[in-house]
Amino acid sequence: MRASTVSLKQTKLIRPPRDTVPGQDRPPNIHYVYTLTSFVCLGSFLFGWNQGVMSMIIADKRWLDLMKPANDWAVGFVVSIYNIGCAAGAMTIGFFADSLGRERTLSLASIIFIAGALLQAASYTITQMTVGRLVLGVGVGAYSAAVPLYITEIAPAAIRGRIGAINLMILCFAEMVVFFFVYGFFFMNSNDWWRLPIAIQIVPALILAVGCWTWVPPSPRWLVAQERYDCAHEVLCRLHGSDVAELEIKEIRESLVVEDVSAQSTWADMFKGPVLWVTFLGTTIQFLQQITGTNAIFYYAPTLFMKGGLTAEAANLATAGVGVVLFLAAWIPVMYFDRLGRKTWLQIGTVGMFFALIGIAMLLRHAERHPGDAANNAIVLFPYLFYTFFNMSWSSGSWTYAAEIFPISLRAKGNALCTASLWVSNFIVAQTTPPIASAIGWGLYILLAMFCVIAFFFVRYALIETRGRTLEEMSQIFGLEDIGGKQADGNSERNELLRSSIDSARDEDNE
């Protein structure tokens, strides 16, 4: 058998809830799944807060006068260096999530996050701010990889898309709140108004650190990988019910057969044989999520609106409206994402994003030729349209897809690599948007629309639909039976019982 990785947790049974008796049959507890998901998604809340907090700050003259950036490239670097930190943080997940566990990795990420927030809030120079952004980015990057990984591994297959959409909804709720929070502080008669929106993040980060270390249970799939089968059985009973707990453990154990016999998986395994194709799909879908324009609009929304003719105050208010649209649109995948499937939603979203980007380009072109025309104010509508389609598709779809397609022995490393791909493309977008916008103006959004065309054909012809499949069946779908185990080897009775249980859980949840 494979040697267990050292665990920081005791190996005794996890204490069951007060209203249960060990060994007693228990029904699926979907509400417990939702509770755990909502709590660990505090990491996504902090992710969303940081996506929105800087867009208004970097457009404020008082902040610019204090920090004195040399040019547009310097402003872009303050924004984009955060993404380098995020990429580094995401890459650490492959090691820490496998050794410490998913939930304790979130605690470690929170400590790093708090250090970065303190550095930023205390900054008086552009260099200090940049270092703080880098450190905080490491924590956010770890959140961005570990949260989807954990919630994917605790969710029944029938609602896994919905669980991923809840992650998105909480992220978007944070973006909405931070926009109005920063907008309110924008009117303070102080050059240091921006410090509080940054410093206040420490509170939820501290709550997440303590909760993940003391209350959140380990992922059952991680427990099986550590050969802690009794603990895994207890967690699965609490999450999915007694009827399928033993069967799911068997599936997970079978998915680790080859890893038990052979050496521990390495980063090189991500680029060998059929796994290379899965790695390509996961990293490309995350890369395209960013390169199609979401943060080219989001990070510089106030600047975009002012170019369209809005005043600084109106531009900030319109930017706050982006947060409202993001939050409202995030409810669509929560309710319907598992009904149509990943590919369908991604294609619908890409088409809508394409036309929204064309609309932005045309109105910016009109604003350049006809400054002061009241029609220029319509530029507000197209970013709203863009984010409606983006949030109902790519915002949750790319994260869900990338987190679920890898075999269990490579899942943590695969998720880390895919998340790092997203942050690298995010860095490219954040760093190049200001100078490209200065050079070609509205042409930037035509360029982004062309990336949407590429994304559409990639989704249509390269992706394989994964809706309704258990994580242990993914190896069969992608032809990785000899890598992830023989979990989908034709035992139809077991798979049918699993599907029956999770379908009944979904029916119960919908009532």
Spans of model-derived segments:
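Alpha-helical transmembrane bundle of multi-pass membrane proteins
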Residues: M1-H240, V257-E511
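Short intracellular "coupling" helices and adjacent cytoplasmic loop segments at the cytosolic face
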Residues: R238-E248
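TPR/TPR-like alpha-solenoid helical repeat scaffolds
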Residues: L247-E259
